[in-house]
Each structure stands twice: as C-alpha cells, then as structure tokens.
Amino acid sequence: MNIDKYTVKASEAVQEASSLAQRDDHSQVESEHLLYVLLEQEDGIVPPLVEKIGVSPESLLDDLDKMLDRKPRVTGQSAQTYISPLLAKVFANAEGYADKLKDEYVSTEHLLLALSESKDETGELLRSRGINLKNLLSALKEIRGNNRVTSENPESTFRSLEKFCRDLTQLAKNEKIDPVIGRDEEIRRVMQVLSRRTKNNPVLIGEPGVGKTAIVEGLARRIVSGDVPDSLKGKRLLSLDLGALVAGAKFRGEFEERLKAVISEVQKSEGRVILFIDELHTLVGAGASEGSMDASNLLKPALARGELRAIGATTLNEYRKYIEKDAALERRFQQVYCPEPTVEDTIAILRGLQEKYEVHHGVRIRDEALIAAAVLSNRYITNRFLPDKAIDLVDEAASRLKMEIESQPVELDQVERKILQLNIEKVSIGKENDTASKERLLKLEEELAELSSKRNAMQAQWQNEKARINESRKYKEELEQLRIEETKYSREGNLNKAAELKYGKIPELEKKIAAVTAELEKKAGQQGQLLREEVCEEDIARIVSMWTGIPVAKMLASEMQKFLQLEKVLQARVVGQDEAVRVVSDAIRRNKAGLSDMNRPLGSFLCIGPTGVGKTELARTLADFLFNDEKALTRIDMSEYMEKHSVSRLIGAPPGYVGYDEGGQLTEAVRRRPYSVILFDEIEKAHQDVFNVFLQILDDGRLTDGQGRVVDFKNTIIIMTSNIGSEYILTAKDMGSIKEEINQILRDNFRPEFLNRIDEILTFNRLEKEHIRKIVDIQLRSVAERLQARRLGLKVSDKAKDFLADIGYDPMFGARPLKRAIQAELENKLAREVLEGKFPEGSTILVDKGENSLIFKKG
C-alpha cells in the first residue's frame, strides 16, 4: 500500500478509519470502519454514488453501527490497532481498479469498488443492497463522465456544474423566480446574440438596480415556457457561483482545475448549457497569483470558438474599469445596454410583483402605494436606480406593516401601561390608613376594574382581527401553491389535473379570499379598528422619510394646505420683510404645485440688504419649516473662498492632489443631506472663479465633484446673501427710488450669466422702530423658553419691552444691537438674581421698567 498514490480524500478516509477503530476499542481496522468513514465524508463522491444506485447512505450507516457494536473490544495501554488482512486486500484491489480505469491516483470510488467485491460482511451488506461492481461502474460513469483522476483532489472536478452553478431553468420551473415585466426588447436582443454561430456571448451592462439579472431570469422563464427560438429550446441556463469556485481552493492550481472542469462540462453538453456569469468583472484577476492564469484567460479560448455560450452582467463603471482594459475579453462579448426604466414602466413592474409581495408579507398593497413608490423614489431617492429602489420601498413598507400586525397595538399597550402604573400606586396607597387614602384606594380599584375590562375587550378584538388577517394570508399562500402546481401539470401535459385545479380548487379558494378581503375592507372603514392590513401611500412616504430625512407629511397632498400659510410662518420670525417673504413663499408654492422646472433647485434667491435685517434668519426659518429641523441648513461662509484655488474646497480636489479622497465641503454636505437649505453667506467676498461653480447648480440642479460623481441639487433651496448696496438702502426714503441703483451695483459686481440664473433678487429693507419692538417679543420668548428649563416663568411689561426696543434700536446694524441690549439689561442682571436664590423653582419673574434700567419682582 503506497499512501503517496492516494488522493487527499482517500488518505483522509484511511486515517479516519484507524481513528474510528481506536475510538471503539477495536484491535483491527476493518472494511466496516473504512466504509463508515467513506459514507460520512463531506464533499466526497461515495454518498452521491450510493444515492445514484437508489440506496440511502443513512440506512447503510445504521446497519454499519450495528455491525461495529458486535465487534470484540480490546482495552488497556498495550492495545494497538492493525489493518486486517481483508482490508489490506481491499487496498490492493483498489489500486488494481485505479489502473483499470487509467487513473493516476487511488481515490475513494476505487476503495468503494474494492469494498463491493470484498468477501467479508461489508461486501455482503453492499451486494445485498444492490451496490455491486456493475451498478457502481454505471453510476460512476454518470457522475464522473470521462474525467480521470489526475490530481490529489479530483472530487472538485466531478459534477462541477451541480456544485458551482445554480440552475435558473429549474428554479423557473418551480416558480422560484419573480415574474419579469417589460424588458422584452432586451430579452430579444440577448436571444439574438445567443443564436449567433461564434462569439455568441451577450453582456448586459447598465446601472446597478436596473434589472440586469432579472432579464436573465426572464430568459429562463421563457426557455421553460418554450417562448424562445428553436436554437434555445430545451436549453439549461446555469448561473456560475464564482464564490463557490474560489471557496476552499487551498492548493495552488485547485481553482483553475475547478474552473476547467466547469468549462469542460459545458463544452461536453454540446450547446445544451448556457452559462450566466453575474458580476462578470470579478472574473478578471480571480484566482491569479504569482504568474498563474486568472479566470478570464481560462474562459477566452472557449468563448472565442463558440464552444461555450455565456451571458455576462456588470455595471457600466466596472465594465469600463475591468473589461474594456482587456480588449481580448471585451471582443468576445457583445454589449446589450439595459437603460433605467421610466416611472410608468416601473409602475407596471411593481404591479407584476404585487401578488408575490402580498403573499410573502401577508398584507394587501394598494395600487396608490405602488404609484407612490415609483413617483416618490424617482423624485427623492436620487443616488439609486429604478425599479430597484421602488421595489425596496414597497418591500420595506409591507414588512413594517407586517411587524405592526404581529406586535401588540399601541392602544392596547397604552392601556396595559396605565394598569401597571395604577397597580404600583395601589400598592403604595395600601400601606396608608387615613381616610383620604382609603377613598383614593376605592377609586383606584374602580378605575383598575374598568381598565381591565377595556384591556380584555381590546385583546379579544386584536386576536380576532389578527386571526382574520392570518386566514387571508394562509389562503393566498395556498392559492400561489395551487397556481404553481397548475402550471407544472400544464407543462407536463397532465391536462386532467391542471383542469381540476384551474376550474375547481383555484376558483373556490379565490372566493374565500374575496370574502375575507371584503370583510376586512368593511371593518377597515369602522372606528376603533386596531390593525391595518393595507399598505397605502402614507406607508410608502414614511419609508422615504426614513431613508432621506425629508419629513413625510410634507410629501402628501393632505399636507399641502400648510404651504398656503407659509407667509405667516416666515413673518412670525422674519420681521419687516414682507416683500421678501412673499416672493420666497410664491417660489416654494410653485415648486410644490409642480409648476416649476423639476431640473433646477427648489428655489434660488439672492438676498441683499444691511446687516442684521433677517437675511440669515429667513434661511433658518425656511429650513425649520420645510424639513422640521434648523440643522438642515448648510451654511458656507464665502469669505473663506477669496483665493482662486479655493474652488477645490467646494467640490473636492482633482485626482493627484492632496485631499482627493475627502470630497468637497459643498458636494459632500449635499450628498449626505440632499434635502436642505444651502446658505452662501456674503458671496461678494468670494473669488470670481467660484461663481462658475454656481452656474451649473442654478441652471441644471447638479454639480460634478472632484471624483466625477454627479451631486443632485434639485431638492435644495439656495439662498445667497450680500451686503452690496447697504448704504443706499439705509439712506433711502423710498425703496422704489433706489431699485435702479441697486441693480447697477449688482451688474458691476456679478456677471450677467450668474444674475440671470437666480430665481429672485430679494431686497431687504432697513428695520424701523416698530419692527424692533416686534423682535423684542420674539427674543423674549426665547429667554422664557430657557427659563422654563429651570421651572421659572417670565412676564415682561410693555414699558419694559419699549425700553429694550429704545436702547436696542440702531438702523445701521439692524436687530443685532437688540440682542446685545437684552443680554446686558435683562439676562446679565436676571442671572445674578436667580443665582442669589431670589426666585425659587416654580415662581414667576415679573420684569418692569425702572428709572434707567429694568427691575425684577417675584410674581
């Protein structure tokens, strides 16, 4: 016995057989031990060989267990194990079978052949089960084909298509593939390329998520249904799993050996197998190390000769980066471009998938939800592609609703929390003996009894509603299964069975589903319903909100009424600038009504006026109103961009420069938060070249950063502020009279192409004394909110407010001196008195005017 001539699996089997004998205290390693370990080997050829003959490996193992239990045991330190003479003969015969089959190494199948001819109990067991030499050789030919054992690890080359590929046609037969809607043109083009004589290898290229893999799955469904040209009828479409090919390839050359075995099997199938290679770019460089060939070079000869038909799929970027660089590989594939479907096509795709998702999640999906998914994803999720992002929206919204159905309703949860709270209170009061406590205890018990009754009723209702929804889900799952069976019987030509299902069981089940659905719809309109089982437009909008940060309510038509009140909201914080507020409100309303250009930002405004009149406050208020968050304001101080080279800080450094990987301050802010108000403060201080960046943003709503990525500005509001012309505004008696001077100053300072792209130029008036008086109220409200945190109230008299307005009024500096006046006259003095303990928690501070200062009293 020359162990060097044994394959890895065969030598492992010999060692494991010896270990098994030692473990069981047997003095000899016999054929039973060897057969036992051969049947238990992972990825070995023996279990599939036995199964091919029609014998279960598990039943053989049970019989071997009984045989091993009957063997005599030898214990003690001197006990050693030896190979029995009969097993030695098995090894000799195995070497003989390896020579007969012209194999270079003794493999596990040769050991099994020798065991089947053995003259002991093991041989008798195998022969009694039909595992004889003739049957084994026949099964071996089917599994091994014409492959010979020429390496120490031959198992990786046997049945390689089954090991390293997924059979898409089989999955389509079993209805495990989602229906493919549309894409007929691309599928026809793929079939056209596949039917060529040579270089019949299409490669699907397109953006991620447009449905490249779905096109191949659609082809698999067509092959199964016979809706293909004669040259493709009856073909098998197999998806190559490159990860499985690489995984576990420990030794040098093992990966290449596996891939060659796959190519060889495809070639031997004589055109019956079409290979689908998803993520085609992963072939380039796969398996290459220290001069060995990579996977793409192994495939090239077979692809060029037309012996191997392959369909590739990869994204545009990866095709350019990997495939185009290898011209020899590129010319062997014919490009089939897959464009992103339109919103209308996406809605059709979603309608086709609707039933699959309804069955999976056990909820109903309304048509309005599908339309909302396509429209909202296209409008708001700009960094991904249709239909993938729309399908994900529907899937997640349905998943969220399913979770709500399966978990306890909020109303019931609130009642249970209240009961728990009252029970704690009851235990606490039960320890007291006074009359008031006893009365409170009686009231508590009454309230607890009432709440317990309410909880029981709600629990019963919840279980009832849940049971109805689960019943509907069960019926839908049954219906899908029956439809799969009907398709299968029709394909097999068993028309009696197909007709029985089509005209009997399926209509009967559809009636049951319709009855349950009608009942659920009837109850859905009633008050007090605890569970919903329909995904609607609002659910989709909520998921979009989670993904993007845009407030859900702002996207729904029911909330559009709020935009009619936009002026009031802005005027509450931006005082004395009614014209500017009106212009901004009109621009926002135009956009929300869908009347503005969707390829430009929501609005772009140049605000000019003196300092402290509300230009920046307008931006903050807009961010708060539109996005419910003042932090949605991205502020960029243009005084930092006074040099020519500072443009790269906005959009990111070009390749080869320091900071290339970091991205730009503006582009990164918008990529991370696409829905924001962008404030460019004091733009007149920026270098002229910086304005070239603005042209693209204002006109097309997009900007390309230093890394070549397109950043979308279509959902941003751009506000630029400038102090240009302040001297005219401060001295003017009438704003109309200085309009021409201001326009001239703007033309002198900014290029015409920049001014021409701005939606509106807003001139902010200087603030008068009555405006400052209104701002006093706003500022004092902020002080009162801060005091509330210390449980202190604040009441300020009108005289005190007038006093603050008088000392805080300076037309040259706007509202900022007022803030300083409030800080000096009110906050500083009040802080001292609060710290001295004059105003304990829960008290109210009354502020009035003294002679030349404010006075504070306890209210």
Curated annotation (Swiss-Prot):
GO MF, one example: ATP binding
InterPro entries: AAA+_ATPase, ATPase_AAA_core, Chaperonin_ClpB, Clp_ATPase_C, Clp_N_dom_sf, Clp_R_dom, ClpA/B, ClpA/B_CS1
Protein's cellular compartments: Cytoplasm
UniProt: ATP 1 binding residues: 206-213
Clp R domain residues: 3-146
Region (NBD2): 559-766
GO terms of biological process kind: cellular response to heat; protein refolding
Region ranges (C-terminal): 767-859
Keyword set, alphabetical order: ATP-binding, Chaperone, Coiled coil, Cytoplasm, Nucleotide-binding, Repeat, Stress response
Residues covered by region (Linker): 341-549
Annotated region (NBD1), positions in chain: 159-340
Region (Repeat 1): 6-71
Superkingdom in the source lineage: Bacteria
Coiled-coil residue windows: 391-525
GO cellular component, as recorded: cytoplasm
Repeat 2 as annotated region, ranges: 83-146
Binding site for ATP 2: 609-616
Gene3D superfamilies referenced in this protein's UniProt entry, alphabetically: 1.10.8.60, Clp, N-terminal domain (1.10.1780.10), P-loop containing nucleotide triphosphate hydrolases (3.40.50.300)
Family stated for the protein in its record: Belongs to the ClpA/ClpB family.
Subunit text: Homohexamer. The oligomerization is ATP-dependent.
Comment, domains: The Clp repeat (R) domain probably functions as a substrate-discriminating domain, recruiting aggregated proteins to the ClpB hexamer and/or stabilizing bound proteins. The NBD2 domain is responsible for oligomerization, whereas the NBD1 domain stabilizes the hexamer probably in an ATP-dependent manner. The movement of the coiled-coil domain is essential for ClpB ability to rescue proteins from an aggregated state, probably by pulling apart large aggregated proteins, which are bound between the coiled-coils motifs of adjacent ClpB subunits in the functional hexamer.
Role of this protein: Part of a stress-induced multi-chaperone system, it is involved in the recovery of the cell from heat-induced damage, in cooperation with DnaK, DnaJ and GrpE. Acts before DnaK, in the processing of protein aggregates. Protein binding stimulates the ATPase activity; ATP hydrolysis unfolds the denatured protein aggregates, which probably helps expose new hydrophobic binding sites on the surface of ClpB-bound aggregates, contributing to the solubilization and refolding of denatured protein aggregates by DnaK.
UniProt cross-references to PANTHER family, sorted A to Z: ATP-DEPENDENT CLP PROTEASE (PTHR11638), HEAT SHOCK PROTEIN 104 (PTHR11638:SF18)
Protein name: Chaperone protein ClpB
Species of the source: Treponema denticola (strain ATCC 35405 / DSM 14222 / CIP 103919 / JCM 8153 / KCTC 15104)
Annotated gene: clpB
